[in-house]
Amino acid sequence: MKTSLRKLTLLGAAALLAVTSAAACSNDDSGSSSGDQSLEIVYWNYGPAAEQGNKATADAFMAAHSGTTVTLTPVTGENWGTYYANVATLIASGKRPDLMVISGEGAQFVHSNNLVRPINEYLDKDEEAKTITSDIAQGLIDGFTVKGDVLTLTYGWNDMVVYYNTAVFKKAGVEPPKPDWTWEQFQQTAKKLTEDTNGDGTPDRYGFTWASNEIFPGIMPWVANAGGNLTSDDVCTATAGTPQVNKAVSFLDQLIKDKVAPAPMPMSDVFTRFQNGQVAMFGAGRWPIATFLPKFKDFDIQLYPTGDTYKTVFGGAGYPILKSSKNPDLAWEYQKFTVSEEIEKQYVGTADKPGDSIPSRRSLARTIAQNGVPPANSNLYYDSIDKHETLVPYPAPAKYSAFESTVLRHLQLIFAGEASVADGLKNMQGELSSIVTC
């Protein structure tokens, strides 16, 4: 199933959720049902991959749990945000699904609107759960924890790492980056890789670029490594006007001014230019390898360079138990099953058909390299969250759709040279102040 951050966007739907929250509370069963062995699961139906992935998991669960029935309810939506709003409508109409698929960015949304049942009690009492969580990096637990409430186990996730074209590095005589490289070393490396082959003043190969249409593989690793975030720790206040954010955006803006990076572009264009050797480095999660392989293999990955600090930026997805569930105990068994070895193996993939996410189980993630799935440094995917500090919380307020579009719009003006970094961030902060609230 798709858990890449590039399509994780949310919608406020405040008026609707006022009704939905009440419906969820009135439907809340404090205990498990007796006799009923059925579950209904809602998921975002973004395409065949979503249908196939959810069906495979549901079929496997029913095969492993005789007598159970799992009904899958696909919910449409242009993005995660409209999907959430449509699920809210479903519950408000009286439907009682047991679980729903959410992205990590949706944690604040579902928690603030009282839609989900935290799993803290299950984690404390279930011995099998203790075995499972011991095999999951703490950062993945923290990513779905809001005000002490653990909302769900993460079945798959992506982190932000730097991809580099190994053929371009070799041709330019540049050594591969090391895990402890700094912003200054990154800048020097990008300059060495930038080349104007025809002397027209415009580089034919740039050292680095980033996505214009996404926050997480765009500015967030730089903001995190400058020691900042776009929201306060309680995700109640925008912090775009802080010195840390200014430092990160200024660094990227200078790359453009120095002509070692073009103006940021959509991620699909980044993929194309990277494979063509027109861009030497870019940032993303594991999902690009599904596009690259099996034809393109001249790539490897490394951590983002360290600034004032280093923090891994990541996000994942899970199946939280809804308060509308009539069978929460069975729903918990299903949630556990989504992180079982049987299911997690599908995220490993093969060299010809790799998974587009990282398994949440440490033991399964380690088999990516063992199975020969590129890149060579694939152990870094899990090490980035298992051995390094992470950016928590997600800068993802309940009104994430408005938040994201506002951030990207002002960044576009800055990187196009239509606004200075200081003025652009000041205007961004002004708009976000009414969007990021609690």
Briefly describe each language-model feature range.
Residues 105-159, 300-303:
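Hinge/lid segment of periplasmic solute-binding proteins
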Residues 170, 176, 386-438:
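Conserved C-terminal helix/tail region of periplasmic/extracytoplasmic solute-binding proteins
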Residues 75-86, 105, 181-187, 262-276, ...:
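Short helix-initiation/N-cap motifs at beta->coil->alpha
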Residues 189-190, 234-264:
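Glycine-centered hinge/linker elements that transmit conformational signals in sensory
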Residues 120-136, 179, 198-209, 228-247, ...:
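Short, solvent-exposed loop/beta-turn-alpha elements that line the ligand-binding surface or hinge
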Residues 124, 288-296, 308-314, 321-406, ...:
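C-terminal lobe and pocket-closing loops
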Residues 145-155, 160, 170, 184-237, ...:
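Extracytoplasmic/periplasmic solute-binding protein
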Residues 2-113, 127-131, 329-330, 342, ...:
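Conserved N-terminal structural module of periplasmic/extracytoplasmic solute-binding proteins
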